């Protein structure tokens, strides 16, 4: 950093030296760390392949015999599961920071993940399913009746989902900062590039899973289709275990969450005590002086509090970050529709056959459309990393992470709007002509409208990820104080999970008979008597309103950050944060 007393002539050589150092760091960002980074990226690739192996066709699995859950019920279960994988992230971050360290926490969570994954091939196999669900219950769940709305075999299904969800949550909270730790001493450019390739690995795992596992599940067998992701988790455990010799690891040094809650509690109590003194006419001068200070300053030792200056400043930084995470909730609500309501919509469009070799024709897996999102990311991230970002950086035009998040919000809003327009057209066509198609041994009454009309909404979500998701990860890691990186990464994923739960709650709300947008309660998977288009338009409207709010938040945050940097560098600024 530049000294506050240096003149322009002193700052220019220093600035040139910093640029040269940055260029050197970019050239050798991963030198000597490739084995460690490779092990982290391969672990994440295998874990994501397993995750998408569960989520890509879970709606179809629960929608079909012998489970026969309604389409809305299956979508709600998947949204709840994905919400759990994110909501549990703060606990995973706390476990690593306070007890185990990141490396051991990841290993433990992968073992728990594997245990939960074993439930799904057992549920899919008839011989073991009866032991888990009860044979009498299975015989009745395929026939509509007064108990049609009940979820067949729900205890075993949700038990497996909870175990997997807790494992995913802990991996998610820790593997991202753990991977960044391998290169963080190489500077912010190395960290930015690591996040690009980390997200690239996530989507490569998704493509492998959606391309192979989803096809096997839909056209061959759910037993085999769920056994493969179980093996992937086992391999991820082995890869990460073997990488222990090359990883940069740190022992647990206390939880930032514990300090955070203590400081928040103390500051609230301190404010209350000050208010009581003012109401009694005591210490008015002291109160007037403290009111000009931050709410948290009373916690500092320099102000008579029990906490160090550094810990209090870390919590103050956290408070400034949380509004950004809150504004991302509607983004995640729309994003998670990709594997739930978008799949329901796919199953009610004309799905082409891709093979007539077998006695039963193989159809294009509905989950394959998610690959358009993943393939787009796979192609554009290297282009962005190697060409676009360097050009923008040279010209000083590289947007901040918050501006990129705002662009991502716009594209995800367009995706929900496109889905609503398509669903409106589908509902009109299905009244004129209905075709019956068998997908995964379930008969769906679909509109005579090609599945390929869904491609735009998936591509729009893919574009949104390149901006919002990657920038969100980068923001969560770079804006966090060093002592709170795991905690803030956990909070980032926590609010992502809130978005999934909001989607599940909205879906349940519009499914009640008083509203009647979703579940018709006449057919387990049929959405032809529903108004899914209204749900999509509602999501687009919520995201649009949030985008306007986020623009205000992001401008204020960027102005404050620039003001702080200018003060730190001794450069006068006329802008007010």
Curated annotation (Swiss-Prot):
Keyword Signal appears in the UniProt entry: no
GO annotations of cellular component type: early endosome membrane; endolysosome membrane; lysosomal membrane; membrane; plasma membrane; specific granule membrane
Alphabetized UniProt keyword annotations: Endosome, Immunity, Innate immunity, Lysosome, Membrane, Peptide transport, Phosphoprotein, Protein transport, Symport, Transmembrane, Transmembrane helix, Transport
Localization of this protein: Lysosome membrane; Endosome membrane; Early endosome membrane
KW Membrane (keyword) present: yes
Expression across tissues: Highly expressed in skeletal muscle. Moderately expressed in kidney, liver, and heart. Weakly expressed in colon and brain. Expressed in low levels throughout the gastrointestinal tract and in Caco-2 cells. Expressed in retinal fragment epithelium (RPE) and neural retina. Expressed in small intestine, stomach, duodenum, jejunum, ileum and colon.
Family per record: Belongs to the major facilitator superfamily. Proton-dependent oligopeptide transporter (POT/PTR) (TC 2.A.17) family.
The protein's role, per its UniProt record: Proton-coupled amino-acid transporter that mediates the transmembrane transport of L-histidine and some di- and tripeptides from inside the lysosome to the cytosol, and plays a key role in innate immune response. Able to transport a variety of di- and tripeptides, including carnosine and some peptidoglycans. Transporter activity is pH-dependent and maximized in the acidic lysosomal environment.
Substitution effect: residue 47 to A: Does not affect interaction with TASL
A molecular function GO annotation: L-histidine transmembrane transporter activity
One biological process term in Gene Ontology: positive regulation of toll-like receptor 9 signaling pathway
Assembly: Interacts with TASL; leading to TASL recruitment to endolysosome.
Protein name: Solute carrier family 15 member 4
Main location: membrane
Transmembrane segments: 49-69, 76-96, 105-125, 158-178, 194-214, 222-242, 318-338, 363-383, 405-425, 459-479, 490-510, 535-555
Highest taxon in the source lineage: Eukaryota
Catalyzed reactions: glycylglycylglycine(out) + n H(+)(out) = glycylglycylglycine(in) + n H(+)(in); N-acetyl-D-muramoyl-L-alanyl-D-isoglutamine(out) + n H(+)(out) = N-acetyl-D-muramoyl-L-alanyl-D-isoglutamine(in) + n H(+)(in); L-alanyl-gamma-D-glutamyl-meso-2,6-diaminopimelate(out) + n H(+)(out) = L-alanyl-gamma-D-glutamyl-meso-2,6-diaminopimelate(in) + n H(+)(in); carnosine(out) + n H(+)(out) = carnosine(in) + n H(+)(in)
Membrane topology category: Multi-pass membrane protein
Annotated positions of the Phosphoserine modification: 279, 298
């Amino acid at each position: 950093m530049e000294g506050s007393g240096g003149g322009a002539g002193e700052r220019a050589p220093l600035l040139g030296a910093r640029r040269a150092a940055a260029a050197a760091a970019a050239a050798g960002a991963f030198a000597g760390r490739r084995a460690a980074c490779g092990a982290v990226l391969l672990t994440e690739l295998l874990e994501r392949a397993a995750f998408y192996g569960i989520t890509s066709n879970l709606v179809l699995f629960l929608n079909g015999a012998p489970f026969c859950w309604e389409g809305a019920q299956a979508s709600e279960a998947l949204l709840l599961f994905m919400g759990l994988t994110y909501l549990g992230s703060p606990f995973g971050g706390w476990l690593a920071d306070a007890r185990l360290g990141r490396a051991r926490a990841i290993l433990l969570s992968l073992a728990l993940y594997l245990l939960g994954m074993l439930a799904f091939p057992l549920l899919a196999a008839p011989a073991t399913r009866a032991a888990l669900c009860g044979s009498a219950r299975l015989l009745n769940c395929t026939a509509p009746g007064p108990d049609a709305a009940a979820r067949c075999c729900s205890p075993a299904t949700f038990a497996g989902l909870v175990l997997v969800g807790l494992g995913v949550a802990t991996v998610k909270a820790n593997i991202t900062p753990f991977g960044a730790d391998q290169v963080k001493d190489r500077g912010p450019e190395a960290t930015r590039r690591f996040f690009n390739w980390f997200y690239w690995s996530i989507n490569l795992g998704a493509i492998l899973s959606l391309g192979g596992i989803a096809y096997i599940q839909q056209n061959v067998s759910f037993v085999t289709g769920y056994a493969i992701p179980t093996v992937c988790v086992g391999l991820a455990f082995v890869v990460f275990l073997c990488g222990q010799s090359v990883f940069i690891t740190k022992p647990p040094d206390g939880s930032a969450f514990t300090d955070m809650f203590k400081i928040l509690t103390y500051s609230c109590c301190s404010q209350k005590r000050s208010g009581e003194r003012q109401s009694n006419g005591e210490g008015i001068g002291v109160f007037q002086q403290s009111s000009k200070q931050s709410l948290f300053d009373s916690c500092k030792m320099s102000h008579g509090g029990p906490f160090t200056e550094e810990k209090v400043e870390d919590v103050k930084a956290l408070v400034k970050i949380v509004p950004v995470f809150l504004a991302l909730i509607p983004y995640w609500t729309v994003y998670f529709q990709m594997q739930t309501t978008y799949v329901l919509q796919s199953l009610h469009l004309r799905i082409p056959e891709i093979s007539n070799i077998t006695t039963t024709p193989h159809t294009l897996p509905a989950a394959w459309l998610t690959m358009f999102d993943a393939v787009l990311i796979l192609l554009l991230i290297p282009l962005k990393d190697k060409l676009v970002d360097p050009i923008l950086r040279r010209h000083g035009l590289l947007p901040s992470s918050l501006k990129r998040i705002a662009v991502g919000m716009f594209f995800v809003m367009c995706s929900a709007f496109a889905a609503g327009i398509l669903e409106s057209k589908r509902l009109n066509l299905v009244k004129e002509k209905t075709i019956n198609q068998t997908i995964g041994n379930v008969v769906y009454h679909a509109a005579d409208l090609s599945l390929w009309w869904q491609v735009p909404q998936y591509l729009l979500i893919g574009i949104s990820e390149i901006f919002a998701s990657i920038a969100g990860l980068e923001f969560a890691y770079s804006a966090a104080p060093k002592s709170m990186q795991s905690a803030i990464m956990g909070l980032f994923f926590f609010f992502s999970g809130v978005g999934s739960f909001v989607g599940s709650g909205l879906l349940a709300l519009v499914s009640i008979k008083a509203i009647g947008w979703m579940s018709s309660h006449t057919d387990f998977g049929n959405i032809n008597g529903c108004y899914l288009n209204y749900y999509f338009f509602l999501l687009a409207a919520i995201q649009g309103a949030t985008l306007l709010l986020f623009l205000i938040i992001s401008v204020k945050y960027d102005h404050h950050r620039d003001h702080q940097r200018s003060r730190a560098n001794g450069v006068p600024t006329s802008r007010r944060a």
